[in-house]
């Protein structure tokens, strides 16, 4: 678990229930993985409206667990979607995949 996320989760729910912390983190990692897979397809199709919705979902997920580093990359993806900029979207997605590979 990324230290930044662990610290944020402990502040929110305490550290007494390690199972809860691990469950929240596992759900987060799963959700992010699913959304990034969707984003890849949406970029390939040039479906920027759908990509914006996916990026919005990712924004919520990252902010819910205090993952500010990934949140910043998600915002770059969302900006690219709003601008219908496939090159910027691909760059942002590559950064997100790099960040999430560390999870």
Identify the role of each PLM range.
Residues 1-53, 57-59, 63-103:
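Two-component system phosphorelay core
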